[in-house]
Amino acid sequence: MQRVFIMVLDSFGIGAAEDADKFGDRGSDTLGHIAERCERGDANHGRKGPLKLPNLTRLGLAKAAEQSTGRFPAGLDKQAEIVGAYAYASEISSGKDTLSGHWEIAGVPVLFDWGYFPAVENSFPPKLLEALVARAGLPGFLGNCHASGTVILDRLGEEHMRTGKPIFYTSADSVFQLACHEETFGLERLYSLCEIAREILTDGGYNIGRVITRPFVGAKAGQFERTGNRHDLAVPPPSATMLQKLVEEKGGTVVSVGKIADIYAQVGISKKVKATGLDALFDATVREMDAAGENTLVFTNFVDFDSAYGHRRDVAGYAAALELFDRRLPELMSRVQGNDILILTADHGCDPTWHGTDHTREHVPVLIYGPTVNPGFYGHRTTFADIGQTVARYFGLSPMDYGKAIM
């Protein structure tokens, strides 16, 4: 049986990329810096001691990181038996965002420039805001700035609840984000507002990658929490990804777990499974692996590494989440049988020790495991698209335009 399971540890970079200077990210290293803080005893909130990732280390994670940076991650086992193929990959896409990373993984790098809202304050063009207020019948808006999603809720959440004005904000990524209270504003109303914003941005030629709803609950500042009802409206990839080819050329099945379907604008997705939180995402992935038939790709994004810990610069939280993932990893590995292959990778970095709150331009790990996979180092991959090309070859699809098959 031909089956592939891809797990994206969202934001899990393993060292600054060659072009990190262009992004202000030279010296960033998500894994390395987390491991250093753990080794020093500076990440003991909710966990304790050196970083413990025995299963990822056996798949080659630490050795891939050493090849990327020249340094073996602090506290990890140098003597571990390697049971998987490992490599590290550079990104050729123009950005360090979620869409660019995932599309490149699927064989379609973003070689054009996204549109951005670079101004930190008064970030959005008045024409855009006026159109959105008019079409949606809004009493106004709040925010209109770059912000951390949790910080802006504490700053503006109460005023939003009192006035009914949605909170608009952005970041260094190509995104337009809308935060509204699920109860006082309404979830369906927020989704409708998101669709209107997507239409205006697309029709206006702003070239913005994603419009993201950020629903939240809570009664006052300090109590607000974002819920799992986030919804992303992305533009579709500019050409066929290996997901789309699997469905169209082989009649295969692509199962999205988490936010994968949104990232690819639903294109090439056969089934969508929603889950919130690392354990729930793991549980859903295990169920879908058990149910997977011939010519099936199960594709999971573990977003919490990025959204809950990377952007929030929470080193201890990120470390604890990695250790949770590692403890549960054998559940995935034990389900890889026959010709199956399991691929673990990331879409960008988000070093929780780095300045600011944005992503970091880093190499990502490429870890491949399966009964037919020969363990060892498979080099420096010069594009994430090598993953897509590998999957295309595995399923017997037409070749992707970018990337070289790893095996």
From Swiss-Prot:
According to the record, how does the cofactor bind?
Binds 2 manganese ions.
Q: Which GO terms describe its cellular component?
A: cytosol
Q: What Pfam families does the database record attribute to this sequence? A: Metalloenzyme
* Alphabetically ordered keywords of this record: Cytoplasm, Isomerase, Manganese, Metal-binding
SUPFAM superfamilies, per database record: Alkaline phosphatase-like, DeoB insert domain-like
Kindly indicate whether the keyword Manganese belongs to this entry.
yes
Query: Would the keyword Cytoplasm be found if you checked this record's keyword annotation?
Result: yes
Note the superkingdom of the native organism: Bacteria
Q: Which cofactor does it need?
A: Mn(2+)
Checking InterPro entries in the record gives: Alkaline_phosphatase_core_sf (IPR017850), DeoB (IPR010045), Metalloenzyme (IPR006124), Phosphopentomutase_DeoB_cap_sf (IPR024052)
Could you say which residues bind Mn(2+) 1 here? Answer: 10, 347-348
Biological process annotations from GO: 2-deoxyribose 1-phosphate catabolic process; 5-phosphoribose 1-diphosphate biosynthetic process; metabolic compound salvage; nucleotide metabolic process
- What pathway does this protein act in? Carbohydrate degradation; 2-deoxy-D-ribose 1-phosphate degradation; D-glyceraldehyde 3-phosphate and acetaldehyde from 2-deoxy-alpha-D-ribose 1-phosphate: step 1/2
EC number of this enzyme? 5.4.2.7
**One Gene Ontology MF term:** magnesium ion binding
The UniProt record gives the binding positions of Mn(2+) 2 as 306, 311, 359
- List localization entries: Cytoplasm
Q: Which reaction does it catalyse?
A: 2-deoxy-alpha-D-ribose 1-phosphate = 2-deoxy-D-ribose 5-phosphate; alpha-D-ribose 1-phosphate = D-ribose 5-phosphate
Family of this protein: Belongs to the phosphopentomutase family.
User: What is this protein's function per UniProt?
Assistant: Isomerase that catalyzes the conversion of deoxy-ribose 1-phosphate (dRib-1-P) and ribose 1-phosphate (Rib-1-P) to deoxy-ribose 5-phosphate (dRib-5-P) and ribose 5-phosphate (Rib-5-P), respectively.
- Which protein are we looking at? Phosphopentomutase
Please report the organism this UniProt entry assigns to the protein: Sodalis glossinidius (strain morsitans)
- Which gene name belongs to this protein? deoB
